[in-house]
Amino acid sequence: PQLKAPMVDVYELTNLLRQLNFKVVSLLDLTESEMRNAVDEFLLLLHKGVYGLLYYAGHGYENYGNSFMVPVDAPNPYHSANCLCVQSVLKLMQEKETGLNVFLLDMCRKRNFHDDSTPNIVLRVTANIVFGYATCQDAEAFELSSTSFINGVFVKFLKKRLLDDEKITVVLDRVAEDMGQFDATKGKQALEIRSSLSERRALTDPVVSGDGHDLAHVHSRQWAKAHELPESMSLSFDCGVQIKLGFAAEFSNVLVIYTHIVKKPADMTFCQAHDLDVDPKEMNRETPEETGIYLLSSSLPQHCLYTRLSSLQKLREELVFTVCLQGTFESMGEEPPIHWTKSVNIRKPLIARLDLHRPVRRNSCLQTCLMPHSPCHSPGPEHHAHLYHQAPDYSRLLSQPHFLDVAELPLGAVGGCGMPFGDGTSPCGLSSSPGRFSIPIEASDDINEVQTVFINSLQLQPQ
């Protein structure tokens, strides 16, 4: 719960990939079944020649050369049957005849001694695969924890290079060199690149229309289906007050609602509107930051009440909430405020339209994990969602000087189709309160300044 980087990393990589014309799906806090369904939806966006990119930040491990992403509901200790195998996802992407497959894995690669299975995933020789591991084999990945807005170590340097018009392996080589000069993690974390890329492929390559133009159009519509925001609306009350509701997307499964009074009678001395059906301690705050909206705060209109709804993938019915208006008039004296209410239905916003909460539907992702000698088996009954990963015992690390307060990094992802998975720490349906998830707005781009700050007071947090 105390970790901050994954949500920030996913948000910033999402914006960078969009600048490169990627269709990005960015998701936080997914259970196993939600992750499998999200992968299936991601695969629907792929076809011949498409560049597919998946970024993941969070709990993970590596056994026998296979990497495993850990969902938020994985038991402790977890096994491969509770996780998603990255190589299994790659095999499914290969079946789509993608032009480039890029995996950026921002997670630890330590062995999981609770998992003794030996995967046997046979991949095709496609000469278009690039892996960028945030750390070396059998090592940990870190985020730098401080009082300021912060990235994980990998993304801190990746975001400065991602838009470079260079072959993707050249970009990652330069990121590795930058990370190697960062004193805070030197000797503890080093980027590892694995590639079978035989052509010059860059994330900046222009999008071209080929034989699959019609198919690409269909896939773009499929992506748009899960990223349409509710239209802003005006609510008029009998007392003469008019309220405007606006909506913004922080991630594919996080919605921001802002409420603003645009008109009221001249003799109304007090007027306030807020959303019911949500926890008032978490919602209807007067600044975005109070409600946990740190990343969008600068682009939202001012002088509103703000509400943040996360984990939209769990929404089973249409989203209906009540707007309550309170007001007093000059003629009322000391009488209590009058209340008016209106019900609002915004159907299923953003990723909620895809019903990722259902049991695994298309068996593509699951079947790949069920190959002979595969580490996975049928997941059985769906686990109840836990809000946070359970951290293992880190007592063995606490003896390291200057690197205390060690905790695991939560799950995050971006993906061109680009897909970021993110394991932030906000609970289902409600935003985190400022005390539990405090992320400032701006990030420093000055590496030297960051080094000085972190060398003086550094907390390394492995994933």
Predicted regions located by residue number:
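Cysteine endopeptidase catalytic domains of the caspase/legumain-like
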Residues: 1-463
